């Protein structure tokens, strides 16, 4: 719960420890995409992964609602955690879901990107603001 998180933050503060929360994106997002399949490239359905690994489901970088959702999450996290940083992951993001998907390909075209690797860079740069 939020109260539990605040207890952990208080415990850390008393010991001069800064907690850096991590919200993974654009990959490692299957749990969120199970709840919000419309933010994926395929529209789901998705199941929460129970095994460690790199999974093919990622947030759709061509869907504006993806950014609205993630910006709201980051805003809430920044209001809870007093530290200056939020880790957004960014590693291990397969780009296969962005290939040949109309929204992702349109974003690539609209932003004058050359391919899906640049779309990932666009995603990270947009979120880091």
Put a short name on every predicted segment:
Residues 1-129:
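Substrate-binding cleft of carbohydrate-active enzyme catalytic domains
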């Amino acid at each position: 719960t939020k109260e539990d998180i605040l207890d952990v933050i208080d415990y850390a503060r008393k010991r001069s420890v800064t907690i850096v929360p991590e919200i993974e994106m654009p990959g490692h997002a299957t749990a969120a995409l199970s709840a919000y399949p419309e933010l994926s490239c395929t529209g789901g359905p998705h199941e929460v992964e129970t095994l460690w690994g790199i999974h093919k489901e990622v947030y759709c970088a061509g869907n504006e609602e993806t950014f609205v959702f993630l910006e709201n999450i980051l805003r809430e996290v920044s209001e809870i955690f007093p530290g200056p940083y939020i880790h957004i992951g960014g590693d291990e993001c397969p780009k296969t879901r962005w290939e040949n998907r109309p929204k992702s390909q349109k974003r690539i075209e609209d932003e004058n990107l050359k391919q899906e690797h640049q779309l990932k860079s666009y995603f990270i740069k947009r979120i880091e603001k």
